[in-house]
A protein has these predicted regions:
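N-terminal pre-catalytic segment of deacetylase/amide-hydrolase enzymes
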Residues: 1-75, 83-95, 244-270
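Short beta-strands and strand-loop turn motifs
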Residues: 23-27, 44, 128-130, 189-192, ...
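Active-site beta->alpha N-cap acidic-glycine motif
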Residues: 49-137, 151, 155, 161, ...
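A cross-domain feature marking catalytic cores of carbohydrate-active enzymes
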Residues: 77-79, 104-106, 128-130, 167-170, ...
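CE4/NodB-like, metal-dependent polysaccharide N-deacetylase domain
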Residues: 90-104, 124-125, 141-172, 179-182, ...
Length: 270
């Protein structure tokens, strides 16, 4: 598959590394060896921190919010589908006429193909969120990363779609992710607004927490995980009602593809 059109020849990490090396050589020539090592040490520190900054395009191009000139916000839901949460979520989205993108986990999609069909039947789009949600997937070997992501692509292909976007588990990136996604034709999508709901384990005041920080252009990260018990599920439903009602009234929600000016998935010929 052809590389994605947003793929850059040299990442920020590669350019920064080259600059650090040149500075080290210059300082080594004009200053002390200890001084010369500073740019390289700083570069290593940045490389260690960068994987955990999901909004930074350090190792590869990352889209975390709108392109310039685009208004609105996009709703995204991670980790599903689940019988205990996805149908309710679809019902509420339909009630308030809100479009969403579901970044699904491959093993969940394989276990519940009827929910994938339901998501599509409601007019929503689907992205790849890895097969097992290994939090450190992006730090694994090239082979492991590609097998994991490709397995999810294959599962969703059986539903008649080909996702064109990938969200790494918990937003962790690495230089190993770039060539894999380029080969598979996937664009990395992260987020610019989140509530730290811990996969719907903490839904207290979810609506107010979102609305206080939500801005035009945001990609909002929420979760499609079933809450811990029936009482928590009722709380989650009530919070979603409040959030979706406010978003519907403000007419702020647009499809993710519209926000980023890039397709999220393609339908396969059957």
């Amino acid at each position: 598959m052809n590389s994605h059109r947003w793929r850059r020849d040299f990442s920020i990490a590669e350019k920064t590394g080259l600059v650090a090396l040149l500075l080290a050589l210059l300082l080594g020539f004009f200053a002390t060896p200890h001084t010369a090592a500073l740019p390289l040490v700083l570069f290593v520190v940045v490389c260690l921190v960068a994987p955990f900054l999901p909004q930074w395009s350090f190792f590869l191009p990352v889209i975390c919010r709108k392109k310039k000139g685009t208004s609105g916000i996009a709703l995204t839901f991670d980790d599903g589908p689940f019988p205990g949460s996805t149908p309710l979520l679809l019902e509420l989205l339909a009630k308030y006429k809100l479009p969403a993108t579901f970044f699904v986990i491959g093993k969940n999609a394989a276990a519940h193909p009827e929910l994938i069909d339901a998501i599509l039947a409601h007019g929503h789009t689907i992205g790849n969120h890895s097969y097992r949600h290994d939090n450190l997937l992006s730090l694994r070997s090239y082979r492991t990363i590609e097998q994991d992501i490709q397995e999810t692509q294959d599962i969703l292909g059986r539903a008649g779609i080909c996702p064109l976007v990938f969200r790494p588990p918990i937003g962790i990136t690495s230089p190993r992710l770039q060539p894999v996604l380029a080969h598979l034709g996937l664009q990395t999508i992260t987020f610019s607004c989140r509530t730290f709901d811990r996969g719907n384990r903490d839904v207290r005041d979810l609506a107010s927490r979102v609305l206080k920080q939500l801005r035009h252009g945001d990609i909002l990260l929420l979760h499609d995980n079933p809450p811990l018990n029936d009482d928590a599920k009722i709380d989650w439903s009530n919070e979603l009602h409040r959030l979706f009602a406010s978003l519907h009234q403000s007419d702020r929600v647009v499809p993710l593809a519209t926000l980023i000016d890039h397709p999220v998935m393609a339908f396969l010929d059957k």
